[in-house]
From Swiss-Prot:
The lineage of its organism: Bacteria, Pseudomonadati, Pseudomonadota, Gammaproteobacteria, Vibrionales. Its main location: membrane. This is Glutamine transporter 1. The keyword RNA-binding does not apply. It comes from the Bacteria. The chain crosses the membrane at residues 21-41, 51-71, 94-114, 117-137, 150-170, 192-212, 240-260, 261-281, 292-312, 335-355, 358-378, 420-440. Seems to be involved in glutamine transport. Complements an E.coli glnP deletion mutant. It is a multi-pass membrane protein. It is found in: Cell inner membrane.
Length: 442
């Protein structure tokens, strides 16, 4: 059996059985390596060798976590939570409450989209912003699976279509570069256009989640946790701190764009908060520790996913799988497009990162797409969609780990069944459909 299919299947089964994701990734990597023809020592060596590939991401998230905690020190998130609570107080009318619910969802969506480009903190804002709002969600009887879908949409869709922030990294630095490296002559301006139709599939999935799947109210237990819920006293805000926050955000974005590093960008923003007096010098250690603690589990999962990816590369399972499919397809172009997307789904769900999937599949997909007669635009859509598939819906993806880190602050939101499964169904299925259509019509 192909090691990619087996190892991803084992990982998903273990995750669905509520086994820790780090354990599931490590165990499935061992199984995949042994089935793929590697010895136990070779498998362990490949896994350990790949762990370093996730270190940069883990450190990035630690720095972003510290930056997000610094933002919270300015009082911005408390201001938002209290503003929402004031709006729903006395809103016993069902229509008024519904209006507030959709307004809140739109606000969360805008903040999430902004976290990918305007304020590039990625998922680090979620454990800061969402826990104070859980009390609001409970009062509105808002299904947290819907919030998870909204958050994941905002984390994934922008990088598929907007060539700024993380989208600039995905579309230009990774996707376009790998297409050029594999001798596909395309322009940077063509990449977002080719990804527009697959991104529309994400929009369809979001609308289904909002207006069909999770529109009914859902009741959660009121958990007494003073650290999560905002106080009933109206908070006071230091205008100077708000101004410093804006300056820090601008500095973080500017430095990240200039240096091309989330680590340096987050560090710059953190230092602005420190020199600006929002964080006292004696508090910097505590703030940084809180940020690292907040993002630690996500960092460990991403490191484990890098080890898993290294084992999968060492087995040559992706190449074998694609070759087996290409020989069985014949000259059936529609079937070729569908199977290429499904293989991308399997790879990304195992690795947990669409950014890491592109270098793996582009080397094989570009010549294969050219051989089947796909246009350059269709090839862009195939490779880009195949990589994005699985990012929403993988237990090891930061696009699902981030939402869970905020929504499960009171222990009432399960990662696999209430984040992974809903996002998989609402986003991966439309992505396959719209990605296939894009490959056929472009």
């Amino acid at each position: 059996m192909n090691p990619i299919i087996l190892s991803v299947s084992v990982m998903l089964i273990l995750a669905l059985l509520r086994v820790n994701v780090v354990v599931a990734l490590t165990f499935s990597a061992l199984i995949g390596g042994l089935v793929g023809g590697l010895s136990l020592s070779e498998t362990i060596s490949a896994f350990e060798g790949g762990l370093g590939g996730g270190a940069t991401i883990a450190l990035s998230y630690a720095m972003l976590g510290a930056f997000a905690v610094a933002i919270s020190k300015s009082g911005v998130t408390d201001l938002l939570a209290h503003s929402v609570i004031k709006r729903i107080n006395g809103k016993e009318n069902i229509h008024a409450a519904t209006g507030v619910k959709y307004l809140l969802l739109c606000l969360i969506l805008l903040v999430t989209i902004s976290s990918q480009n305007v304020v590039p903190v990625h998922i680090a804002f979620i454990p800061i912003l969402i826990p104070p709002l859980l009390q609001v969600f409970n009062k509105l009887k808002l299904d947290r699976r819907l919030v998870a879908c909204v958050l994941t949409f905002g984390l994934v869709t922008p990088y598929m279509i907007l060539p700024v922030g993380f989208g600039g990294i995905f579309l230009n630095n990774i996707l376009l570069k790998n297409l050029h490296d594999n001798h596909l002559d395309v322009l940077a301006s063509q990449v977002p256009l080719a990804m527009a139709l697959p991104a529309l599939g994400m929009v369809v999935g979001l609308l289904i989640a909002v207006f069909i799947s999770y529109r009914k109210p859902r009741t959660y237990a009121e958990v007494d946790n003073s650290e999560l819920a905002p106080t009933s006293v109206e908070p006071t805000f230091n205008k100077r701190h708000i101004q410093i926050s804006i300056l820090a955000i601008i500095a973080a974005l500017s430095v990240q764009l200039y240096a091309g590093s989330m680590i340096i960008g987050a560090l710059a923003g953190f230092m602005v908060f420190t020199f600006g007096g929002v964080i006292a010098w004696k508090e910097t250690q505590d703030v940084f520790t809180r940020g690292v603690h907040m993002m630690a589990m996500i960092g460990f999962i991403m490191i484990s996913a890098a080890g898993f990816a290294a084992v999968m590369k060492a087995t040559g399972g992706v190449e074998t799988l694609v070759q087996a499919l290409s020989t069985s397809i014949g000259d059936n172009k529609p079937l070729a497009a569908l199977l290429m997307l499904i293989v991308g789904l399997l790879v990304t769900m195992g690795i947990g990162s669409s950014f890491s999937t592109i270098p793996i599949i582009a080397t094989i997909y570009v010549p294969l797409a050219i051989a089947f007669g796909f246009s350059p635009m269709a090839t862009i859509a195939l490779v880009g969609t195949a990589a994005a598939l699985g990012d929403a819906g993988s237990p090891a993806s930061d696009s699902t780990l981030g939402p869970t880190s905020g929504l499960n602050s009171d222990g009432q939101h399960e990662h696999v069944w209430e984040t992974v499964v809903p996002t998989f169904l609402h986003y991966n299925l439309p992505l396959i459909i719209f990605g296939w259509i894009a490959a056929m019509v472009l």
